[in-house]
């Protein structure tokens, strides 16, 4: 089970991948709590229902007891690309390992599905996201007009080392993620 950072939310901190049946309720829970994750930024457009309906099995949530501490909305494509649409940690839980637990869980699942690379994007003004992704080993490339004219973004990219018996013999290189492979990720709450 994905256990990680010490939480002050009244219970053990665990990471789970929601089921599609849980998607609509989780989507509503996230939308209702957006200010507690994103402050005054309007990020509703990042949270379309498809991320927790059709792609629920690739999403990750971290809870401390019944409190949602963080979530990651992502997908692993047939072309072996893992993409992170949104990752967020509740403001009071930042700096306690929740974001890393979200990524560890997602990347281990993506790796098990054969993903070779993961990508994510943010706005150039989001210095916290840029620093966080760099600490995880991502490269960060500014891309002019990435999201349309006048909408520049920073594209994060990270090579994933494959799962397998020989993995332990090879140290991860720059731009690769050294997370521990796991296949025991729980489904649902």
Language-model regions, residue ranges each:
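Conserved G/P- and acidic residue-centered "switch" motifs that form tight phosphate/ATP-binding loops
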Residues: 97
